[in-house]
Amino acid sequence: IYSLPEFDGEHLATYGGSQGGALSIIVASLDPRVKCVVSFYPALSDMTGYLYGRAGGWPHMLKNGKSSVHNTPEKLNTISYYDVVNFARNLKTPIFFSCGYNDRVCPPSSTFSVYNSITSPKELMVVPESAHWTFPDQQKRGFDFVLKQFNMK
């Protein structure tokens, strides 16, 4: 994107839902050129939650808990390296975050684990009746957040 003549080199945001929501946080935590983030129900979040009696995030690799023969110590250790919670702790940019209470793909407990790990300025929009999708109001709030961060609104 930095090689494109249309890009001003300053106004860079990451924006996405589910796996895109996860990647929006991961990229922003790794690249200081990102100025703000919009993340809807990020996947890859709190993936070890099942081991502690709560729903874990997509792709639900540990859904069978500690009883799975596939849950080797190496696997459990490696998962933490790409769990979004790990990246959210390092986020320095403002973020708009939104999720719904009825999401079975990326359960609210997993997404709140990410949100609660963020120390940068953050806004939260919870839509109780929403599942694994975004309503137009959520999208509008996300776009408005970006415009506000860039002093365009």
Region locations from a protein language model:
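C-terminal catalytic histidine-bearing segment of alpha/beta-hydrolase fold enzymes
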Residues: F112-K153
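Glycine-rich nucleophile elbow surrounding the catalytic serine of serine-hydrolase chemistry
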Residues: G16-I26
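Short alpha-helix in the alpha/beta-hydrolase fold that links the catalytic acid
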Residues: T93, P107-N116
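Acidic catalytic loop of the alpha/beta-hydrolase fold
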Residues: Y101-C106, H132-W133
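Gly/Ser-rich "nucleophile elbow"/oxyanion-hole loop immediately N-terminal to the catalytic nucleophile
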Residues: I1-S18
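Hydrolase active-site cap/lid region
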Residues: I26-N71, V126, T134-D137
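Active-site nucleophile elbow and catalytic-triad environment of alpha/beta-hydrolase enzymes
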Residues: N71-F87
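Short beta-strand/loop motif that positions the catalytic acidic residue
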Residues: L91, F96-C99, D103
